[in-house]
Amino acid sequence: MASVADRFDCYQKSVQTPDHEVVFFEQAYRDAYDSTPMDLREDFCGTFAICCDWVASKSKRTAIGVDLCSETLQWGRDNNLAKLKKSQQKRVRLIEQDVRKRNRPHVDVLAAQNFSFWIFKTREEVIEYFKIARSNLKSKGVMVMDMMGGGECYEEGLVDKRKIVKGKKGFKYHWEQMSFNPITADASFAISFKFADGSKLKRAFEYHWRFWTIPEVREMLAEAGFSESHIYWENDDDDRDDDGYSSWERQEKAPSDASWICYIVAVK
């Protein structure tokens, strides 16, 4: 099964919940400005599933997807964009370029999801990116990023396994923590997919990042000119929404869980 599997399809089914992201972006913008966001920019957009869900959620919403990988963008055109109505497709703009470039029109929400900005390994690189991201926002705009952490995230060789699809056509998702250097905070991770027949797409995706922390990122956002930043921490399982997704609230204190994910929202 691995020989005919589509790694991008497996990734989307395992990692992405674009409808949930749209709801959270609305919450983050509403908390900052008490109004509804209409225009989105998705940096490191990959297959730009979030862009597609964004324009489908309201009739006048627009989305810009920015990514360097032509293969990934084309997969998104064939498999995500093609599923939209023609009128919705017209409201998605794709730009194949480095995210560290300024573009118009400016947007209400700029998202850099799945820890993607961790590819920048120095403060100078991150601050430069944050400054450019800020300039791509309207006067009332927010930047949304997710973060992970906790002691387990530094354990080399740890593999988190989850069953994504059950049955004969099912598969499992493996998140592997390949290496971590405590001196430089360089970290490597990989995603593999294991199928019902025992075959495997080993390390279908690899990531070589700097493991940034929340305080570091908030300090760099301030240096880049953002007026404030907020941490959205996941509520208890009892507080999940009607679709079973986690709910999030602003917090300034959180438990030291073995592993956690949160959002950072920077307000222009």
Pin down the residues of each PLM region.
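Conserved class I S-adenosyl-L-methionine
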Residues: 36-46
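Conserved SAM-binding loop of SAM-dependent methyltransferases across substrates and taxa
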Residues: 47-60
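Conserved SAM-binding strand-loop segment of SAM-dependent methyltransferases
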Residues: 84-99
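A short glycine-rich, Lys/Arg-flanked "PGG" loop and its adjoining helix->strand segment in the class I
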Residues: 125-139
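Conserved SAM-binding loop
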Residues: 76-77
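C-terminal lobe and adjacent flexible extensions of AdoMet/dcAdoMet transferase-like proteins
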Residues: 208-268
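SAM-dependent methyltransferase
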Residues: 144-220
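A short acidic, Gly/Pro-enriched loop at the edge of an enzyme's catalytic core
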Residues: 100-110
